[in-house]
Amino acid sequence: MPCRCLPVDADGLSLTALSGSDAAVCYVTPSHQFPTGVTMPAGRRAELLHWAARAPGRRYIIEDDYDSEFRFDTRPLPSLQGMAGADGPVVYLSTCSRSLAPGIRIAYMVLPRQLLGAWQEKYRLYSGTVGRFEQQTLARFITGGYFTRHLARERTAYKARRDALVAALRTSFAPEELTLAGLHTGLHLLAQLKDPPPDAALRAAARQYGVRCSLLSDYDLTGTAHSAAGTLVLGYGSLPDADCAAAGERLKKLCTAAREASDTV
């Protein structure tokens, strides 16, 4: 099945690009687009549902609700599946790998009614790879209210960690040197350098200073996103709170070294 990548703007997936394609299925992560960190607003979600509704039964949306649990500063938006309803064109996917642990290996799918019969016909003999004990344990964890309380504790902890990293970056960099984005959802943020050195110099400096980070341009599959240059993708999910200040200082040294190296070439 041929797949095509579409551009992302400040509101998420470009509907102009999608409408200009011959796609029958659109795979999207509206809650938190990786790696840009963009959350699709309600208006764009309604437009996406309208795109599918223009060809009923022939267009579908696969909604991967990636990172929807980790929204810190604003109220959560309704999912596409929730907006469309059970008879809508949305296949909803989610997992417990981020909110609990990857080792649980439990994910789930919510199908629209019009696809349920086809699924039961084609996959009626399919057996899941996760044992019933794990599934029933998770079900009890959810229905008992423990999962909700667990998520609340996680959000509090990750928000504090994000705040510590943001404070460290703003201490190490002058306002005119760095712009931060993608702060409100998920477990990573974007740090865009002003007048940045080449990305190749940043990669070399990251190796030199032992910093594990990626660049936004690493995810550009079209080779045309020039605005991605000089933008670091910084994950903080496993960063100890006590190390945030040192992380900001090391990142500053990394960027200085990259700029000096590029100036000498």
For every predicted segment, state its role.
Residues 10-72, 262:
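Active-site phosphate-binding strand-loop segment of PLP-dependent enzymes
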Residues 208, 224-265:
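PLP-dependent enzyme catalytic core of the Aspartate aminotransferase-like
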Residues 86-156:
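Conserved core segment of the aminotransferase class I/II
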Residues 86, 199-203, 213-241:
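Active-site-adjacent capping/gating segments
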Residues 139, 155-166, 178-192, 204-205:
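Conserved glycine-rich beta-strand-loop-beta hairpin in the small C-terminal domain of fold type I
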Residues 2-10:
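Short beta-strand->loop structural element characteristic of the AMP-binding/adenylate-forming
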